C-alpha cells in the first residue's frame, strides 16, 4: 500500500504540473486580438455587419469608429460605399472542443456612429447579443439566430427585425414604419413612441409597458399573450 500511495502521489504531482504548463501555453495561444480604427464621414454611407459569435454594440459617437476585442479574426473592408464587417474563427484556435478554463470566450465588436451618417444598416448575428443605444437610424435590418436584441434611447425608422431564439427588448425609443418579429422568446416594448409598426411573435409573449396614450401598432402572437399597460 505504501508504494501504491507514493506512486499515486507522484502521478498526481506530475499530472498537475503538466496540466498547468499546457493550460498556460494554450492561454497564450488564444491571444486577444484588438482592432480600433476611425473612418471619415464620406468614406461610406451603408454598413453591413455579419457576425458568427461576437457580441455587437452600436452607439452614438462623434466619429465613425470600429473597435474589436476577442480571439476571432475580424475582417473589415469598403466595397461600393458599403463598410463590410465580419468575423470568423481564428485558424490558430483549431476546431477541437475548448477544455481550457483560462480561456475567456468573450468577443465584442463596438461601433460608434454620428447621427444621420448611415443610410442603411444591415446586421446578421449568429450567436451573440445585439445592443443598439442612443442612435438615429433609417432603413435598418436585423437578423439574429441566438442572442437577445436590445434597443434603447434610439430613433429608428423602417426597422425590419427578424429573430429566431432571440428575445427582443425596446425601451425609451421612437419606432416607426417598422416590422419586428420574434420566433421564440419575449418581445417587450417599454416607454416608447410607436407609429405604423407591426409586432409579431410565434412562440412567446408581447408586452407593452409604460406606453403613451397614443400608440399606432398592430400585434399578434401564435402561442403567448399580449399585454398592454399605459404610463401611469
Q: Where are the model-predicted features located?
A:
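Acidic (Asp/Glu) and glycine-rich low-complexity loops/linkers
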Residues: 1-125, 131-144, 150-163, 169-174, ...
Amino acid at each position: 500500500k505504501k508504494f501504491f500511495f507514493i506512486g499515486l502521489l507522484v502521478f498526481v504531482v506530475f499530472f498537475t504540473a503538466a496540466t498547468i504548463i499546457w493550460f498556460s501555453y494554450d492561454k497564450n495561444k488564444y491571444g486577444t486580438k484588438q482592432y480600433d480604427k476611425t473612418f471619415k464621414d464620406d468614406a461610406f454611407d451603408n454598413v453591413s455587419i455579419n457576425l458568427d459569435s461576437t457580441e455587437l454594440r452600436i452607439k452614438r459617437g462623434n466619429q465613425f469608429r470600429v473597435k474589436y476585442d476577442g480571439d476571432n479574426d475580424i475582417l473589415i473592408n469598403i466595397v461600393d460605399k458599403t463598410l463590410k464587417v465580419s468575423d470568423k474563427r481564428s485558424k490558430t484556435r483549431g476546431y477541437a472542443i475548448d477544455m481550457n478554463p483560462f480561456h475567456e470566450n468573450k468577443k465584442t465588436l463596438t461601433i460608434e456612429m454620428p447621427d444621420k451618417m448611415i443610410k442603411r444598416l444591415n446586421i446578421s448575428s449568429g450567436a451573440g447579443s445585439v445592443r443598439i443605444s442612443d442612435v438615429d437610424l433609417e432603413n435598418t435590418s436585423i437578423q439574429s439566430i441566438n442572442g437577445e436584441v436590445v434597443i434603447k434611447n434610439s430613433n429608428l425608422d423602417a426597422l425590419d427585425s427578424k429573430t429566431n431564439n432571440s428575445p427582443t427588448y425596446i425601451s425609451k425609443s421612437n419606432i416607426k414604419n417598422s416590422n419586428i418579429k420574434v420566433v421564440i422568446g419575449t418581445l417587450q416594448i417599454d416607454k416608447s413612441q410607436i407609429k405604423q409598426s407591426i409586432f409579431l411573435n410565434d412562440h412567446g409573449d408581447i408586452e407593452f409597458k409604460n406606453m403613451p396614450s397614443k400608440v399606432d401598432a398592430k400585434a399578434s402572437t401564435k402561442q403567448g399573450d399580449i399585454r398592454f399597460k399605459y404610463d401611469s
